Amino acid sequence: GYRLYDAAKAMVRNWAPTMSHNLSVNGKSGKTSYNIGLGYLDQSGMSKTAKKDDFKRYNASVSVTSELNKYLTVRASSIYSDRNKRYPGIGNTSADPWLYMYRWSPLFPMGVTEHGNPLKEPSYEMAASNTDNLQNKYYNVNLGFTLNITKNWDVKFDYTYDRQTSETNSSVTQYEAGATWYAPTAWIENGSQVFANEQGER
């Protein structure tokens, strides 16, 4: 018979923990109200063999509104978010390990040879790859006021400034591994290769 290989079992973790923390403070003092929020998210990726596969996010928000007098109310708020995704840098988007995980037949070998040398297969590509990352940052500031002219008329003004940045760090993976695309040559115990003729004779 033939040995069957389970690529999903070799590459995908059975579980991936997520940690989330949120803190919110709000209150009012006189004619001034405020709200402060802080958040942290840490998610582990599903890759079993990658050096790093996770996602982290930090976010914060603050808002203040104050009625200075019966004619003027001012307000200000701000939001900040920092997201960072780390993942195995395969360097190939058209035929990455996730594609081959389901494309390859269960007969394709995974792991190492009988001599302990790694094979070129999806799980080893992830293990041998460098860690790439994608970081997104977002910043937003709002300023405004309300001017009460009469009992039934008021003027509202709001100004918003925001900025978003995205930074990607990628690398080229270099590794040595045995090819599985070609018919392997068997070995006998003393380390010599085994060759057979057309009649199957050694």
Describe the residue ranges of each PLM region.
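Outer-membrane beta-barrel channels and translocator barrels
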Residues: T18, S29-G30, T65-Y71, N148-T150
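Hydrophobic, lipid-facing positions within transmembrane beta-strands of outer-membrane proteins
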Residues: M19-L23, Y58-V62, Y139-L143
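Transmembrane beta-barrel domains of outer membrane proteins
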Residues: S24-K28, S63-T65, G144-T146, D158
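Short, Φ-rich (hydrophobic/aromatic) sequence segments
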Residues: L143-F145, I149, W153
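Surface-exposed loop/interface segments of Gram-negative outer-membrane beta-barrel transport/assembly proteins
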Residues: G1-R3, L41, G45-D53, N59-Y138, ...
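Residues embedded in well-ordered regular secondary structure
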Residues: G1-K51
